[in-house]
Amino acid sequence: MNTLNFLVQKDKIQHTVLRETPDLPLADGQVRISIDKFALTSNNITYAAFGDAMNYWKFFPVAADANDVAAMGQIPVWGFGNVVQSSHPGVAVGERLYGYFPMANSVVLKPGRLTPASFYDAAPHRAELHAVYNQYMRCNVDPFYTPESEDVQALLRPLFVTSWLIDDFLADNAFFGAQQTGTDAKMGEGGVALLSSASSKTAYGTAFGLKERAGIEVVGLTSPGNVAFCESLGCYHRVLTYDQLDAIAADRACVYVDFAGNAKLRLAIHTRFANLKYSCAIGGTHVENLGGGKDLPGPKATLFFAPSQIKKRATEWGAQEFGKRMVQAWFAFTKVACDPAKPWITVAHHAGASAVTAAYADVLKGQGDPRVGHMLSLSRAQ
């Protein structure tokens, strides 16, 4: 048997290749997972864009091939898989798992730190990587899990967890002085939270939480073609295009939550808003315009790392309370986002190598319908 892998060139992520590798016999303590399906979103493009800086390439390292013209990498994705072989006494064949997988049709893991709810991949190369990404949830006891919502879980769960943590991080820090309680955000009063790439799932998940905070106006920034979609969500007080920054008074206290990673936009915001309190860099949906944050006016652009906030809150609240709050927030969000009468997301399925390649190219361009979420599979038939 062979494993089919979807690889990208690390320094030119628009260049891709499909490569088969022979399956080796399992060592003691290993399991083989058939990766059933996985989500592909702008968040995964961020993983690739920051692959070296944030160690995303290290999760599923790619051995060099004689035909490679440059170093290749495997983008991590969130999805579901089934245990098809096991040499570990604590993991049974047939178990369904949710977690962090490569863009492939199978993967070998080495379960460690087993509990009834989950295990961690204890492979040596992942020991230095953050535990949040090494955990695999056992679906039969996962509090997030319902069989009918698997696609939505794969598409939105990791993004919403990040969104929830960004909202919590900003509130935890009192919006770095931008929040002005006693003001009416609906009237354009108080501080401002500017969210770029407002149509992205992580951005609107963040806005969903932020809008409930007093004293802060949530303003989504997007391209002209996505204004109507963003406005239809109802989670932004206002939606503006990227060239409408002058619609916000230059002296208003604000924080910038940058999902786009667009260097020109970041410079424009840092230059216009003299009372910018904090600049939070989340990702890079605008891959063609990624740039650094050096020599900017105002505060330094600071990369948000979700596991740090997880660790802080788990310490303060306790792991059980942290998990309880996160699950409650998830179901509150999906109740709105998955309302059949007005869904925020519809699912498109892409099965087979050619379909996966085409879907990746579309997501990389960042010009698709923001209401569509892409579920991919290299194990299902076309």
Model-derived regions, located:
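Glycine-rich phosphate-binding loop and adjacent beta-alpha segment
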Residues: 268-336
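Glycine-rich beta-strand-centered segment in the early N-terminal region that forms part
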Residues: 26-38, 52-108, 113
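N-terminal Rossmann-fold NAD(P) dinucleotide-binding loop
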Residues: 203-204
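Conserved N-terminal Rossmann-fold NAD(P)-binding element of oxidoreductases
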Residues: 192-197
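C-terminal hydrophobic helical "lid"/dimerization subdomain
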Residues: 310-382
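NAD(P)H dinucleotide-binding glycine-rich loop of Rossmann-like/cofactor-binding domains
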Residues: 100-191
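Adenosine-nucleotide cofactor-binding segment
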Residues: 211-266
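A short N-terminal beta-strand-loop micro-motif at the entrance of redox/enzyme domains
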Residues: 9-38, 42-44, 49
